[in-house]
Amino acid sequence: LTYYRSLDELPPFDDYDITKGRTYKYFKGDVLYPFGYGLSYTTFKYSNLQVADGEEEINVSFQLKNAGKYAGDEVAQVYVKLPERDEVMPVKQLKGFERVTLKSGENKKVTLKLRKDLLRYWDEAKDKFVCPSGDYTIIVGASSADIRLQKVVSVLQKDNYPMSHSEK
């Protein structure tokens, strides 16, 4: 859930076009509480982002360290920015997350697998889902606004990924 600083930042209530900034995916301003925001009694450091392009998925791994004095939980989030296109595209989309519990000073390697078929989007002109090849930005952080790591990776996609179970 995203809390905007002002109602003036939202499109009219009867305008359901999300590309006009209705969600964190398209909103470009500063918000009061960004999507994924949380509080903690400790601090976490992210490092060593590794991204590997596989045939059916993209493997994202990074180190997460509890740099504070207390044990705590962190919900590490992975967002993806799609390659630049002519049509309106999301600023970023949440594609994975993991809740990690760490003791003070503890370090852990976090690995998330992002299925390539979930990177597709609906192309209005083609009237179908497409998975464009190109430069994807992999974004890792504590919320949609608290970005700690990012890396651009060239991804080879195909348009014929099987549909997920929920779409059959």
Language model features with spans:
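Intrinsically disordered, low-complexity Pro/Gly/Ser/Thr-rich segments with frequent PxxP/GP/PP motifs
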Residues: 86-124
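Short, hydrophobic/aromatic beta-strand segments
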Residues: 71-78, 90, 122-125
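Short, surface-exposed ligand- or partner-binding patches at beta-edge/loop junctions that are enriched
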Residues: 113-144
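Electropositive phosphate-/nucleotide-binding environments in soluble metabolic enzymes
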Residues: 40, 103, 130
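Interdomain boundary/hinge segments at the C-termini of tandem beta-sandwich modules
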Residues: 153-157
